[in-house]
Amino acid sequence: SNKEEIAPGGLNTNILNSYLAHLRKENIAEASIARAVVVLRNFARFCEKEGGIPSLLKDFEPPRVPKRLPKALPIETINRIIDSVSIDDAIGLRDRTILELLYSTGARISELVELKVRDLSNLIEQQTLKLFGKGNKERVVPVGSMASKSLEDYLVRSRPMLLKGKRGEALFLNSRGEKISRQIVWQIIQERSAKAGVNEHLSPHTFRHSFATHLIDGGADIRVVQELLGHANVTTTQIYTLVTLDKVRESYFAAHPRAK
């Protein structure tokens, strides 16, 4: 609350530490505090470069932000959301297929909306499809039998109705027969989960996290999960083992006679 003007040359580590303590007292998130440090350090570097004012913050490291564990839904909840979608009309069948596919493949929302019909060329014979990830990197992923069946039904019963005689390569279409947008996929997830009585804030990434967590819980090798998720580095995938480790720890303390 005591505001005091500080000249750029006076910005030192003691002042920055006091500022961080003040932010923590105000319950500012660690990620925001880390960003503030980076901004101030860059400002000090700019003053040094442009005005010849030596930076006293060169070696000041931003606080380490604890890794947020991804939110995964229980299998029963995923099943409840997917199974609650009626497939009696073209939109319902499309929505159900989108949910099936997000959970079956762990696709990112950007990969899902960019899917083209030709990316399914091996669906019948090999039960796989092509996804194009970050940097347009192609990967082939297996499609589970329920998602596969839903896709086949969608291609026969729903997509032609949505296309309304137009020509189009996009796999998933909106009600005007155009490529579906990310916003509509978000909306589908929000509305369909609310209808199933799941009132948590869900996103397409929730399905991706659930996909990875359930695979690792089921004993899948981390390298396989890395490949399926399209992670360039296995360390990105290792966060899912932390989720599982939490469950292991919980079970241990609940079950071991001398640990309770």
Show the residue positions of the predicted features.
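Conserved catalytic core of the tyrosine transesterase superfamily
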Residues: S1-K260
